[in-house]
């Protein structure tokens, strides 16, 4: 027997009929699951209504401030991280930091001055803090902004 389009039926239990309320005296008849009397039985009330209690959206504090849409976010790398990832020194660029897993790809990189630097490194990044620039130059390296 070949399968025809008119023989197709949805899987059992996948389609559940919508409960029709207020039709006769059955389980969802008469009061239709609304109880007896009161506002909720006679008309709809908002979902947020809590029966005279102070609603949750008014109990919570308001959010202050704003989020600047034009802020530039930088991935942070400390001088100590560079020292740990590149102990031999040399030229360190953003691509090298991505390859070592220190920063994400296509991210702007800022170098901060936390930690010690022992090897001479020539770092190129998008931004440097003053202390990071001082530590890199003190170790004999150079800090180049992209």
Curated annotation (Swiss-Prot):
GO MF entries: rRNA binding; structural constituent of ribosome
InterPro entries linked: Ribosomal_uL15, Ribosomal_uL15/eL18, Ribosomal_uL15/eL18_sf, Ribosomal_uL15_bac-type, Ribosomal_uL15_CS
**Biased composition, class Basic and acidic residues, residue ranges:** 1-10
**Swiss-Prot/TrEMBL GO biological process terms:** translation
Domain of life, per lineage? Bacteria
Q: Which UniProt keywords apply?
A: Ribonucleoprotein, Ribosomal protein, RNA-binding, rRNA-binding
| Region Disordered, residue ranges | 1-41
Q: Which GO terms describe its cellular component?
A: cytosolic large ribosomal subunit
The subunit structure is:
Part of the 50S ribosomal subunit.
Instruction: Please describe what this protein does.
Output: Binds to the 23S rRNA.
Family to which this protein belongs = Belongs to the universal ribosomal protein uL15 family.
| Alphabetical list of HAMAP family matching this protein | Ribosomal_uL15
| Protein name, per record | Large ribosomal subunit protein uL15
Q: Which organism is it from?
A: Mycobacterium tuberculosis (strain ATCC 25177 / H37Ra)
- Tell me the name of the encoding gene: rplO
């Amino acid at each position: 027997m070949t399968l025809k389009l008119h023989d197709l039926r949805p899987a059992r239990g996948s389609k559940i009929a919508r409960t029709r309320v207020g039709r006769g005296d059955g389980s969802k008849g008469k009061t239709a699951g609304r109880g007896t009397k009161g506002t909720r039985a006679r008309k709809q009330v908002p979902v947020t209504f809590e029966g005279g209690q102070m609603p949750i959206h008014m109990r919570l504090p308001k959010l202050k401030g704003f989020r600047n849409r034009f802020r530039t976010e930088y991935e942070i790398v400390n001088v100590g991280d560079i020292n740990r990832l590149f102990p031999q020194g040399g030229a360190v660029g953003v691509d090298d930091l991505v390859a070592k897993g220190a920063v994400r790809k296509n991210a702007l990189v800022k170098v901060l001055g936390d930690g010690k630097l022992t090897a001479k490194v020539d770092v190129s990044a998008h931004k440097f803090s003053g202390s990071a620039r001082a530590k890199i130059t003190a170790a004999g390296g150079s800090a180049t902004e992209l």
